[in-house]
Amino acid sequence: MGQKVHPNGIRLGIVKPWNSTWFANTKEFADNLDSDFKVRQYLTKELAKASVSRIVIERPAKSIRVTIHTARPGIVIGKKGEDVEKLRKVVADIAGVPAQINIAEVRKPELDAKLVADSITSQLERRVMFRRAMKRAVQNAMRLGAKGIKVEVSGRLGGAEIARTEWYREGRVPLHTLRADIDYNTSEAHTTYGVIGVKVWIFKGEILGGMAAVEQPEKPAAQPKKQQRKGRK
């Protein structure tokens, strides 16, 4: 059987950035990796209702900088920044170095694979029909400008005795094209019948120019100059 490689892993360094960007020598590497895992585990649990898309960790000079990408920055920050200050203290304790927490807003949650997958799982847990949840996610993504989307759910769908897999796809989802900007993520719905797995692939277009094009902020389009009409003398 043909197997699918992880769409994010194969594109790292080509059109996808890493979620942890730091360098460590052999002695510190394992400790850093462990603290990264614990920080992510804590933040994911603490901010379960804050629509967190991804957590990026950097380690500049004996400190840790955590960037939380979320669709609901208000919930993360809290009243007068109280919640984010509490998070900062706990992260500093876990990592053992001074911590800084930045918040990045996800402007279009319908085009973020993690948030789409989480939305479907929350609907499945509320006993919404799985086909309706999938179709709604596909329609919303295409309406907001996705070039293609594929949604797959797997498990005891609708409480069936035998587990099965169903999927919907609209538009193009080119998994082999390395320059294709494909956002992929998964989530799990814990229902009374068992666990239902959800996978989401969103194709946002092709990135020409590799990582340099990804890291550069988008420049505003130059306004065309109006040609001055010369009057008759």
UniProtKB/Swiss-Prot annotation:
PROSITE patterns on file: KH_TYPE_2, RIBOSOMAL_S3
Similarity-based family: Belongs to the universal ribosomal protein uS3 family.
NCBIfam families documented for this protein: rpsC_bact
GO molecular function: mRNA binding; rRNA binding; structural constituent of ribosome
UniProt keyword annotation of Glycoprotein present: no
Subunit and interaction comment: Part of the 30S ribosomal subunit. Forms a tight complex with proteins uS10 and uS14. With proteins uS4 and uS5 encircles the mRNA as it enters the ribosome, which may play a role in mRNA helicase processivity. Some nascent polypeptide chains are able to cross-link to this protein in situ. In collided ribosomes contacts ribosome rescue factor SmrB.
Signal peptide: none
GO biological process: cytoplasmic translation; ribosomal small subunit assembly
Gene from which this protein is expressed: rpsC
Protein name from the UniProt record: Small ribosomal subunit protein uS3
Domain called KH type-2: residue spans: 39-107
InterPro entries: KH_dom, KH_dom-like_a/b, KH_dom_type_2, KH_sf_prok-type, Ribosomal_S3_C_sf, Ribosomal_uS3_bac-typ, Ribosomal_uS3_C, Ribosomal_uS3_CS
GO cellular component: cytoplasm; cytosol; cytosolic small ribosomal subunit
A family per Pfam: KH_2
Annotated function: Binds the lower part of the 30S subunit head. Binds mRNA in the 70S ribosome, positioning it for translation.
Species classification: Bacteria, Pseudomonadati, Pseudomonadota, Gammaproteobacteria, Enterobacterales
Record's keyword terms, sorted: Ribonucleoprotein, Ribosomal protein, RNA-binding, rRNA-binding
